[in-house]
């Protein structure tokens, strides 16, 4: 019998109803790393109201050709001023890290400059902050039915409108999110 732990790097975490933390209601989190040392993920379903990628580049003094009116996402409650770019594998500049052979994550100004100049990855999204778990914490939340794990598709990650990502991710996993409940029953 294989007793090796299951790690969720490269998967999507979907918050279940009644997760118990309002910051994570309807969250979709792209897992960047998960191992015996803990876990880190970036939220991809909660745009920060009024904040666009173009505005962030303007704040950083990075020129850009296009308006770049894509939203910036609340990546999580940890280090909310730290930026991350989750992107396709067709760009691998300074500090780009491959995540489970699926997508990449970068946090340097190099990728922001590349996006501003129109030479960045073909698919990307920008987030501020991240969700982090200490060793064993995420596993404990899984036991308490806080999260559902699913592979999720690149189309879900990059093309689905943020307001639909949570429900669409469940649908991809074969689950009708409208039928999820916080109530349990007895048999």
UniProtKB/Swiss-Prot annotation:
Which family does the record claim for this protein? Answer: Belongs to the UPF0301 (AlgH) family.
Domain of life of the source: Bacteria
Question: The organism's lineage?
Answer: Bacteria, Pseudomonadati, Pseudomonadota, Alphaproteobacteria, Sphingomonadales
Q: Name one GO cellular component term.
A: cytosol
Name the UniProt record assigns to this protein: UPF0301 protein Sala_0165
- What Gene3D superfamilies does its record include? VC0467-like
């Amino acid at each position: 019998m294989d007793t090796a732990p299951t790690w969720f790097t490269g998967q999507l975490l979907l918050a279940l109803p009644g997760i118990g933390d309002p910051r994570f209601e309807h969250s979709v989190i792209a897992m960047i790393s998960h191992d015996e040392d803990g876990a880190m993920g970036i939220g991809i379903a909660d745009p920060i109201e009024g904040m666009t990628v173009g505005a962030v580049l303007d704040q950083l003094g990075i020129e850009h050709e296009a308006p770049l009116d894509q939203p910036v996402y609340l990546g999580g409650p940890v280090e909310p001023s730290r930026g991350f770019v989750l992107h396709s594998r067709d760009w691998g500049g300074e500090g780009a890290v491959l995540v489970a052979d699926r997508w990449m994550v970068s946090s340097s100004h190099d990728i922001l400059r590349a996006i501003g100049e129109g030479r960045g990855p073909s698919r990307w999204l920008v987030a501020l902050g991240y969700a982090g778990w200490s060793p064993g914490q995420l596993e404990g939340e899984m036991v308490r039915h806080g999260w559902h794990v699913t592979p999720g598709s690149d189309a879900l990650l990059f093309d689905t409108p943020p307001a639909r990502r949570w429900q669409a991710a469940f649908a991809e996993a074969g689950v009708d999110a409208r039928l999820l409940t916080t109530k349990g029953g007895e048999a």
